Structure formats: structure tokens, C-alpha cells
Amino acid sequence: MALVLHCGSGNKNAFKALIAAEYTGVKVELTKNFEMGVSNKTPEFLKMNPLGKIPVLETPEGAVFESNAIARYVARLKDNSSLCGSSLIDYSHIEQWMDFSATEVDANIGRWLYPRLGFGPYVPVLEEFAITSLKRSLGALNTHLASNTYLVGHSVTLADIVMTCNLYYGFVRILIKSFTSEFPHVERYFWTMVNQPNFKKVIGDFKQAESVPPVQKKAAPPKESKAKEAKKEAPKEAPKPKVEASEEEEAPKPKPKNPLDLLPPSKMILDEWKRLYSNTKTNFREIAIKGFWDMYDPEGYSLWFCDYKYNDENTVSFVTMNKVGGFLQRMDLCRKYAFGKMLVIGSTPPFKVKGLWLFRGQDIPKFVMDEVYDMELYEWTKVDLSDEAQKERVNAMIEDQEPFEGEDLLDAKCFK
């Protein structure tokens, strides 16, 4: 009998076995019309996996569950498969990277994503920990891939299949470009893998996530008691204007506009400034800085300095940089209305964190102060443009001038 993979289409854990099958030539059939919550609750399915989890591979010798175990089984059905390496050390390194992918990459993507989708409580501190852990893991992966095309050896192995499938889930759900661009070798590796014919045949075409999913808010409990009371009080004989009442009650409320969209039009087009900033590669001060002040509208926008209040805690460089990166991720909700530069300053700890922000309007937007908890960790000072020293400081921060205020720059990040 052919191998049967019990799972819905589009599942990244099923992709692992299906891609391995493309490399080995093993025939694996994906069950048709699989319905999660129904198909995996049948007595037949529960005999194969008592927990009802997917995927499950049905073989002539019995069922196999857990996606990595299934992928191993498919890969080893072909003698001397290159997917499993050519030596004991290759095999060990493949297992090493498969474990790393599961515990350091996939797990941290899930810890960041699932609470935002409502699968568990959303706790900002735990999210920050998940993001920091994921960045640390991707940093290690990035270092390895700086000098390696594949995770192990000189061709695709099972380690690459598992890693790519786990990264795929992150790329399509939560890992936006501004996040992944910090790991250029991981990006290069990922896009190279998913465009390999055997990967592409299974995964198909897709786009990288453009925004981090918003936190799902719990729906208000239905007011059953009031509805029942109203029902009792209503006279049976009295005619009810059913259609009109239902239309009024069910009419969707118009989505409230962002207060910043109601401000008077500004001569400054923020996207034009962002394009100028991104496209200026030489003579930055003469082109980009001059262009900024030519565009700047002091009535429609305001500039703000921010200084981290707890710099004495910034004793580890990568933790400090990850802290700033997490802040910028959470600022994504105001990308339409803001531009920012964040600098990590100093060659030895404790490191200083300072920033410059351009916001629509004359104040820091209220929805940013309400939603981004990092805001209260910084001291905010509005830039006084009548002070030439402050204006020059703006220039230096936009330009990533080094040294900055007499100190080395450890890192500079841009929010645009």
C-alpha cells in the first residue's frame, strides 16, 4: 500500500514528509477532505494517535506520528539517501539542527504568535522573552549560514527540510521583513530553499507577512439575562417592526477613524521622506538631511528625542539590541504616522539607548502611548527647532553619525 499522510493541506508539519518524499521518490498520498476537529477525532484516527494530533503517517507496518519522526521514516525508505548524510558525524549534525529547529526556532515563533491569535493568555513580558529568544536563535543560525549554503554538507538534507518548514510558518504569519532583515544569511538561505523545485512543488507560492498579527481581544459576554427580560416584558399581541428593528440592531458600526487622519492636511508626505532616506546611499547629509528639512512641516509633524531610563541595566550588548528591536516591532501599529531612529551607544557596558522620532501631529499619538508599553521606559523630550544644537542633534541621529556625542555607535536601527 502507498503511504498515507493524514493531515490537511497547507500544514507546515506535513510539508516535511512531502518534501522528503519528493527527494526520495517515495509515494506519499495526502488524505482528501481532511477536516480538523472531525477527521482526527474518529476511532480509526485515535487508534493511530491517541492524542488526535496531526500529522500521522499510515504505513504497511503501522502508524507513525510526530512530524520529524515521519520525515525521518520517509527519508530512510531510500537506501543511501543523501537526506540523511554520508557519515556518522553528518547524521549527528542533521539531528542537531533538527532539534535546534524544533526547540529554538519553531517553539519561539509559537510563543510569540499563538498568544496574539488567542491561543493562550497574552503577556507582554513573555512575548518580549520569546522575541529575544528567537532573535538569539536566528542570530546563531545566521552566523552558521554566513559560511554555509546548507546546514550540513553540500546538499539538501533532512535538517534543511525541517528548518525551512518551521521558518516558513514564521515567515507567512509573523516574521515581517523589518524583523528578518536583521538576519540576511537566514533570509538568503530561506528563499533559496523554498525556491528549490522539490520544495516549491509542495509549498507553492506565498508572500512574507506584512504585519505582526494584532492581539485578539476577548469578546464581551452576551447579555442573555437582559435579552430574556426584554422578551418577557414584550406584549404578545403587539406588532413588532421586525425588519426595521433588525436592520437598526444589525447595522455594522462604521470603523472609527484614527484621530491622526482627521488632522489638517500636511505638506509633508511621510512616504516620500522614507523613500528619500532609503534610496540615498552617498552624500547623505547633502541629499537626505537637506531633503528632510525641505519637506518637514512643523505644523503637521513633531520631532521627539527619547532616552532610555534604565541604561544601567544594559550590560549585555545583544540583549540591549534585542530590547530595541522588540520596541520597534511593537511600534508597527503607527508605521503610517511615524519615522524613527534608535541608537545603541558605547563600546563597553552599560550601553546607552537614545532615539529620535517623527510623529504626525504635535503630540505623541495617544494610541501609541496606550498600546506600546515600552513608551514609559523612555524619557520623551520634544525637539525645540529654534535651538540650533538640538537641530544638529537631529541631523546626527538621522545620519547615524559616529562618534555620536563623543561615543562609539554599537548599533543603529531605523523605523520606517
Curated annotation (Swiss-Prot):
EF-1 is composed of four subunits: alpha, beta, delta, and gamma. Residues 1-82 form the GST N-terminal domain. It comes from the Eukaryota. GO terms for molecular function: glutathione transferase activity; translation elongation factor activity. Keywords: Elongation factor, Protein biosynthesis. Probably plays a role in anchoring the complex to other cellular components. Residues 256-416 form the EF-1-gamma C-terminal domain. Residues 213-263 are annotated as: Disordered. Residues 221-245 have a biased composition (Basic and acidic residues). This is Elongation factor 1-gamma 3. SUPFAM superfamilies: eEF1-gamma domain, GST C-terminal domain-like, Thioredoxin-like. The keyword 4Fe-4S does not apply. It comes from Oryza sativa subsp. japonica (Rice). Residues 87-215 form the GST C-terminal domain.
